[in-house]
Amino acid sequence: MYKVYASADYVGYTQPLLDTGKWQLVYDIGQADVVLFAGGADIQPMLYKQPMGRYTYCSPRRDQIEVADYNYAKMAGIPMVGVCRGMQLLTALEGGSLFQHVDNHAGYRHEMLTDDGSILLVNSLHHQMCNPWDGVEEFKLLGWAPEPLAGTIIGAGDKAVA
């Protein structure tokens, strides 16, 4: 059973996780087998070296908490998983960049193409996206929207997945 630490959960930033019987939620990052960074508000543009955009709505307190959790997990060698905002956060903190605003994308259902040729139907509930051409060497692009925009990335090693 995996011990999962949900970053920023203790201050109310994440929704309850579905219990599958394969993981246990822990509240001490030092006890975690994996750190989860979930969806939510926009990433502060200063984290990926851009000015604040017109449509950007951030949670500076959450960013502060999650950057500290990222730094701890990286130092301790704890694998990290990023979903939606979490993937964007890991990309920014690993030196990549984001498209700060993509018009007509929030609330949009679209296909995602995968590196093995599969096609998935996904919902996009955000307007920020990872820039797949501003490569983070530790990440491999696994899936992208038809535009193409990054949808799924994985760490090349065993310590970071988004």
In which residue ranges do the predicted regions lie?
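N-terminal beta1-alpha1 cap of cysteine-dependent amidohydrolase-like domains
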Residues: M1-R85, A92-F99, D103-A160
